[in-house]
Each structure stands twice: as C-alpha cells, then as structure tokens.
Amino acid sequence: MSDELDRKRRHFVGATALGMVFAPFGMNAIASSKPGTVPAPATGTTPLAGATSFHSLKQVKAGVLDIGYAEDGPARGPVVILVHGWPYDIYSFVDVAPILAAAGYRVVVPFLRGYGSTTFLSADTPRNGQQAAIAADILALMDALKIKKATLGGFDWGARTVNIMAALWPERCKAMVSVSG
C-alpha cells in the first residue's frame, strides 16, 4: 500500500470515527430547527475543507515537557483532546479540529514527545515512548491548561494513549474515541 493511500485511509477512518461520535451532539440543534433553515455554528470559526494548518500553535510547560499544541474553538467550550499516532503529527487532525470548534468545542491537539515543537525540559529526563508515559504527558498537559475533564480521541499510538488515560484516570475522561488502538 502506498504511503499516500495509507495516509488517506487513516485520515478517513479517523474523521469517520470522530464524526460518528460527535454527530449526536449536533443533532439537537438540527432537530429543533424549522424546516428549510440551517442552524448557525456555535462560534465564528468556519471549517475549511482541505485546511493545511491550524489557526494558532502554542507552547506550555507540562510535567517533563514543553508541549507544543494547536488550539481552536471557544475557551470555555467543552474540551476535546485529539492525540495523533506514529509516525504522524497534529496535522492528522487539521480537517477535524475546525469542525469540532465550529460546533462549540475547545479543541486541543498536542504534539507528542519527539514531534513538532514538543521538547524535554531537562537533558537528564529518560526518553521513553511507551504509551503510559505519553498518557502521563497528556495528563500533565490537562493540568497545565487547567482542564479537569475532556473527551479524548486518538488513533494508533494516540488510541492506546487515550485507552490508558480512560483506564487509569477515568475521572478525567468524559468520553473516549479510540481508532485502531
């Protein structure tokens, strides 16, 4: 299978799974609207088909890392954290994040260890790619951003990471979408 075909397949599976999970949340607005009307998005963010970048990239010190992440949507909206897999990065969610943001969700998409602008704070910190370590990184990110509870979504390594988070810290997980994990 070519890399391009594999990338498109993963994107389709991830977007479909997230769409299936989040579709019921938007159905109330559609069901209560009058025939012939289209409900307005919850925020001023308009999803762009074929987007190639995020509106903003940020950094925050969290646990043993300085984590780079994209954020979209209203600051006080319900939080969705999307976790990429290996060897992908946050741009796997560049088409999904604006859709969730337009539906009123605060979307946080972090670069995992070794990706993008995420770096270790100390050269002495052991390098570890286990999903349990990555789950602890996402928990530290939630603490740094003062997020008490979030809907967690991920694919590949990200799926395993959110599975671990839901198992070890269920009080921090509102819901979970795990694709290929």
Task: Spell out what each predicted region is.
Residues 62-63, 102, 109-155:
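Active-site loop/oxyanion-hole signature of alpha/beta-hydrolase fold enzymes
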Residues 72-119:
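Conserved HGGG/HGGXW glycine-rich cap/lid loop of the alpha/beta-hydrolase fold
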Residues 92, 124, 133-137, 161, ...:
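Ligand-binding pocket scaffold of soluble enzyme catalytic domains
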Residues 56, 82, 108, 153, ...:
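Conserved Rossmann-like nucleotide-binding pocket used by diverse enzymes
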Residues 27-63:
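C-terminal segment of N-terminal export signals and the immediately downstream linker at the start
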